[in-house]
Amino acid sequence: LKDKHYIELGFAKYDLKREKIKGFPEVILALGKDEKHLTEIVLKAIKRTKKLLITRAETSQYNAIKKTLGKIKIKVTYYKIAKLVYIGETEKNKIGKIAVVCAGTADVPVAEEAALCCEFFGSRVERLYDVGVAGIHRLLNNVEVFEGCNAVIVAAGMDGALPSVVGGLVSCPLIAVPTSVGYGASFKGLAALLTMLNSCSVG
């Protein structure tokens, strides 16, 4: 444990041991990072690993990363709606199946962030979007999506009821994700969070 398994940059210490312990490299959070700091972390890290995942990246940060890696022959992909940057190739041999579900179209950015992260880490993902409880038939007409799932991720704002409904339909682990979508007494996602925490269906 005392061995140095990180890249020392002064302003950051990029963890090299994470990939050996967890099976995938440390994820880089772009949120709040200076572009110079972010690009330097990426440049140093990509020399030691075959792929990188950067989350909460703005377009300007992606452009800075792409410019920095311009001379290196490596694939750089930006998913604007999810604010994710993939560097390198994703796993081709997918393991398991995860369904990512969201209640409304406004919840898609959160759902896509989860879905793309799962794909980056090597899982097969089935997406089912805009199936909130206001039109429950949309969900019930697509329940076959849950067949063979190892896990389900459900994102919802407003009243946050969708995870409880899905929880009553599946036997695999379910991760409920509240979003800030809503108005009135939604309190920027707090209402959805409390609904999910008090769900009576197994999750």
Regions found by a protein language model. Name each.
Residues 142-179:
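Glycine-rich phosphate-binding loop
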Residues 27-28, 52-53, 97-103, 152-154:
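Short glycine-rich or small-residue beta-strand-to-loop segments that form or flank ligand, phosphate
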Residues 1-72:
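Long amphipathic alpha-helical segments
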Residues 84-86, 124-145, 191:
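Glycine-rich oxoanion-binding loops at beta->alpha junctions
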Residues 102, 181, 185-203:
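C-terminal binding/interaction regions
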Residues 75-79, 166-189:
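Short, acidic/small-residue loops that bind anionic groups at enzyme active sites
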Residues 95-135:
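Glycine-rich phosphate/diphosphate-binding loop of Rossmann-like nucleotide-binding domains
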Residues 36-38, 107-112, 136-137, 156-165, ...:
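Short glycine/serine/threonine-rich phosphate/pyrophosphate-binding segments
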